[in-house]
Swiss-Prot record:
CDD domains hit by this protein: LamB_YcsF_like
UniProt xrefs under SUPFAM superfamilies: Glycoside hydrolase/deacetylase (SSF88713)
Gene Ontology annotations of biological process type: carbohydrate metabolic process
Protein's name in the database: 5-oxoprolinase subunit A
Function comment: Catalyzes the cleavage of 5-oxoproline to form L-glutamate coupled to the hydrolysis of ATP to ADP and inorganic phosphate.
Gene Ontology molecular function: 5-oxoprolinase (ATP-hydrolyzing) activity; ATP binding
InterPro entries: Glyco_hydro/deAcase_b/a-brl, LamB/YcsF/PxpA-like
One Pfam family named in its UniProt record: LamB_YcsF
SUBUNIT field: Forms a complex composed of PxpA, PxpB and PxpC.
Family: Belongs to the LamB/PxpA family.
Length: 252
């Protein structure tokens, strides 16, 4: 029987700023990537999100970023590999401490935003991220864009790796995610999200924005929680996958 991990980025509120629909989306995913202070996620939010994941049986992972609260982690900051490694390690440690206090162990690490995108193509940055994960624990899985430099760096460090694809992001013909600057970069329609996900999981193919079929093997599928209608899309994905005979579960 086919199975797939369904993950979401969450815990991205901070202080008075509320971002995303965690309560609406978490019941439908199997893994959660929790912001840990770099771009969002203060200690109160982190603890609440970990508790909610524990209640729902959702696997918990860290979602570190460039130290960029003002830009929500979507800006590329000029940092050395050593600085990136230290910042990622610190964020993993912060969430791990809170999780352990709640009786939860981290399962994976997925970079956020600009750090995710740069690590997908820049082996130096990817290696810095992988070093941080390995320094914390070789048991943590490193999540990165399928067929990316980050997946390669994780393997080189001896880490378990999870190749990620997206239910709600459009792809270019070369396999890159379509830049968010374009209005068609996000897939909002739940039916379209399910169609893309089924193609990836069952056929190992995603249809690019220009109609090109692109080979894509994924261990985990991300659905974003910070866009309008996120909960409805997550529900449609979960129910649609199960109706197609595909089990939604953590990969290990």
């Amino acid at each position: 029987m086919l199975s797939i991990d369904l993950n979401c980025d969450c815990g991205e509120s901070y202080g008075a700023f509320q971002i995303g629909d965690d309560e609406g989306i978490l019941p439908f995913v199997s893994s959660a990537n929790i912001a840990c202070g770099g771009h969002a996620g203060d200690p109160i939010v982190m603890r609440h999100t970990v508790r909610r994941c524990r209640e729902l049986g959702v696997a918990v992972g860290a979602h570190p970023s460039y130290p960029d609260l003002h830009g929500f982690g979507r800006r590329v900051l000029p940092m050395s590999p050593a600085e990136i490694e230290a910042w990622v390690l610190a964020q993993i440690g912060a969430l791990a401490a809170i999780a352990r206090a709640e009786g939860v162990e981290l399962r994976h690490v997925k970079p956020h935003g600009a750090l995710y995108n740069v690590a997908a193509r820049d082996h130096v940055v990817a290696t810095a991220v992988a070093r941080a994960v390995a320094a914390f624990s070789h048991e943590l899985a490193l999540v990165g864009l399928a067929d990316s430099a980050l997946i390669d760096a994780g393997r080189e460090m001896g880490l378990p790796v999870l190749a990620e694809a997206f239910a709600d992001r459009a792809y270019e013909a070369d396999g890159r995610l379509r830049d968010r600057r374009y209005p068609d970069a996000l897939i909002i329609d739940p039916t379209a999200c399910l169609k893309q996900t089924l193609s990836i999981v069952r056929d190992g193919v995603v249809i690019a924005i220009d109609g090109t079929p692109v080979p894509l093997q994924a261990d985990t599928i991300c659905v974003h929680g910070d866009t309008p209608g996120a909960a409805a899309r997550a529900a449609a994905l979960r129910h649609g996958l199960e109706a197609a005979g595909i089990t939604v579960r953590t990969p290990r």
